[in-house]
Amino acid sequence: MKKLAKKLLCLTAVLALTLSLFTGCKSKNEKTLFEYAGQEVTFQEAHVYARIMQYQAEAQYGAYFGDSMWSMQVGTDSKGKKITMQQSVKDSVINQLKQIKVLAAHADDYNVKLTKSEKKQIKESVTAFAKDSTGKKVMKKTEADKDMIQKLYEESTIASKVMQAIIKKANVTVTDDE
């Protein structure tokens, strides 16, 4: 009887530990990479943007610079430290995501919503992206599905509309003297 009790206790402990491994865990793609102004950015969101920028840069500059383009110096920071193409792309992705998240978070403040026409256009763009060779590579590498890509398109479109609303509200005019 004592042996049976020990085995049951052991089995219960093993089951409890096993279940704890599977509950409350997020996949790498769902994990929050960073938070900015109260807005979460997941690893997958950043990964999608980074891959798009990577493939665009490789298509544009790869023939000229080859694989060494990512370690090539493209500038210096305020401390005089060299900035590589790779670091520049990473920084651009982070800054772009920060801007999109903050602007999209203010959509209600400017009464910005997607129209039916915009939603239709986004759906068509997502379908085209998923069929495009670059889009296929991005989706495969990042494990993003069409829903994820659509979410990014929608958020980016909303951010753009908020930016337009801010500019319109500011009523900025530039004279010839400036």
Task: Cite the ranges covered by each PLM segment.
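Hydrophobic alpha-helical transmembrane signal-anchor segments
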Residues: C10, V14-T18
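Acidic/polar surface patches and capping/hinge elements
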Residues: D147-Q150, K161-E178
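N-terminal targeting/tethering segments
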Residues: S27-K151
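Alpha-helical transmembrane segments of polytopic integral membrane proteins
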Residues: T18, I100-A104, A159
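C-terminal motif of bacterial Sec signal peptides marking the signal peptidase cleavage site
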Residues: S20-G24
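Acidic, Ser/Thr/Gly/Pro-rich low-complexity segments that form flexible
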Residues: E155-S156
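Bacterial N-terminal signal peptides that target proteins for export
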Residues: K2-L11
